[in-house]
Amino acid sequence: MDYIQHFSAGSKHVSKKSVAVDAEARKLVENAAVNYVTKHYKGIGYTVTSREKENVGWDLDAEKSGICLKLEVKGLAGNTISVRISQNEYKSMVNNKDCYRLCVVTNALCNPSLIIFVWDDEQSAWVSDIDQSIKISIEEKPSYLAVVE
């Protein structure tokens, strides 16, 4: 939180230090989320492989009994679900609906909770795997914004 001191109220200038701290904080949240999702899927018998550095449109492969899931992991520091999806991730979601999972970890750094969104053909929407009344809308922009409706 030290970076807050470097931002002047009313100023539109954000110091390089605050940007660096924000990037570091985002990386911590993302790493915690990836670790949480990996642990979750391993706990239910999947073999999990990182694809993060390959730029394939998802972060992890999860394989079990001939099933291969493509897991895109989004970590959030709080519990409001609103995540950025890159064009590459969105293209992968659309092209792999049957095996793609959008795994959102809220409160990733303390008391994490996992919500997994899967494609539902009947609703033509991405819905929570445990409560299909929870669905996300995806707003197209240079990157995509997915928000719980």
What annotation goes with each model-predicted range?
Residues K16-T49:
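Acidic-basic catalytic patches of nuclease active cores, encompassing PD-(D/E)XK
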Residues Y41, L60-A62, C68-G75:
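Conserved catalytic cores of phosphodiester-cleaving nucleases, focusing on short active-site segments
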Residues K42, E54-V56, S86:
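Residues that act as N-cap/strand-start positions at coil-to-secondary-structure junctions
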Residues I44, V73-S124:
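Catalytic cores of nucleic-acid endonucleases
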Residues Y46, I67-C68:
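Short coil/turn segments at beta-strand junctions that form active-site/ligand-binding loops
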Residues R51-K64:
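Beta-rich nucleic-acid/ligand-interaction surfaces
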Residues V105-E149:
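Domain-level recognition of nuclease-like catalytic cores that cleave nucleotide substrates
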